[in-house]
């Protein structure tokens, strides 16, 4: 993404986040953004909105479909995007909104990768560790199973990583032996 596109997406995202914070509607906006992103995660939808060959009115119709089940704040926000002909940036803007919401509220998704599934007790202890270590609050715990890490875990939250996996320890040992 070029600097101009990044700047535009940040401006739009920050404006929606500001409204969400002022109006105490962060959970609603968060849920709506996640719902919109669940549709926009489809590359075909992104390509449709970005295509110069497709008429602007057709793109607007697709974006207006999101408005049917959204709060007034999101409806107005989407309308501004349509008026400014920024439909092609909708996916990037929504991703940036999630990032900004997390930064402002210190509430993040925590991704945990383990070799085997975690018990409920382990999840609770891990969540407490991450919240304390990273000074954040958990929104969702996203669990991934990867038997290639052999043992231990890899935690990712707020662009930070704790890697205690056996695989990484073996790789580190290998590097030290060279």
Swiss-Prot record:
Location in the cell: Cell membrane
Is S-adenosyl-L-methionine set as a keyword in this record? no
Cellular component per GO, a single term: proton-transporting ATP synthase complex
Name the Gene Ontology molecular function terms of this record.
Answer: proton-transporting ATP synthase activity, rotational mechanism
Top-level taxon of origin = Bacteria
* Topological relation to the membrane, as annotated: Peripheral membrane protein
Give the matching InterPro entries: ATP_synth_OSCP/delta_N_sf, ATPase_OSCP/dsu
Keywords recorded for this protein, A-Z:
ATP synthesis, Cell membrane, CF(1), Hydrogen ion transport, Ion transport, Membrane, Transport
* Family to which the UniProt record says this protein belongs: Belongs to the ATPase delta chain family.
Q: Which purpose does this protein serve, as stated in its record? A: F(1)F(0) ATP synthase produces ATP from ADP in the presence of a proton or sodium gradient. F-type ATPases consist of two structural domains, F(1) containing the extramembraneous catalytic core and F(0) containing the membrane proton channel, linked together by a central stalk and a peripheral stalk. During catalysis, ATP synthesis in the catalytic domain of F(1) is coupled via a rotary mechanism of the central stalk subunits to proton translocation. This protein is part of the stalk that links CF(0) to CF(1). It either transmits conformational changes from CF(0) to CF(1) or is implicated in proton conduction.
Q: How does it assemble?
A: F-type ATPases have 2 components, F(1) - the catalytic core - and F(0) - the membrane proton channel. F(1) has five subunits: alpha(3), beta(3), gamma(1), delta(1), epsilon(1). F(0) has three main subunits: a(1), b(2) and c(10-14). The alpha and beta chains form an alternating ring which encloses part of the gamma chain. F(1) is attached to F(0) by a central stalk formed by the gamma and epsilon chains, while a peripheral stalk is formed by the delta and b chains.
Q: What is this protein called?
A: ATP synthase subunit delta
The source organism is Streptococcus mutans serotype c (strain ATCC 700610 / UA159)
Give me the gene this protein comes from: atpH
């Amino acid at each position: 993404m070029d600097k101009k596109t990044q700047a535009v997406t940040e401006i739009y995202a920050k404006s929606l986040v500001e409204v969400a914070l002022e109006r105490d509607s962060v959970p609603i906006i968060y849920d709506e953004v996640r719902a919109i992103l669940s549709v926009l995660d489809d590359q075909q939808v992104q390509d449709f909105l970005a295509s110069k060959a497709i008429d602007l009115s057709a793109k607007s119709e697709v974006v207006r479909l999101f408005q049917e089940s959204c709060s007034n704040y999101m409806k107005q926000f989407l309308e501004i995007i349509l008026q400014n002909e920024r439909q092609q940036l909708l996916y990037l803007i929504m991703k940036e909104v999630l990032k900004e919401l997390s930064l402002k509220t210190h509430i993040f998704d925590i991704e945990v990768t383990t070799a085997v599934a975690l018990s409920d007790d382990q999840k609770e202890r891990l969540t407490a560790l991450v919240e304390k270590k990273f000074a954040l609050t958990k929104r969702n715990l996203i669990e991934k199973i990867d038997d290639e890490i052999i043992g231990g875990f890899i935690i990712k939250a707020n662009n930070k990583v704790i890697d205690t996996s056996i695989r990484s320890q073996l790789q580190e040992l290998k590097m030290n032996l060279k």
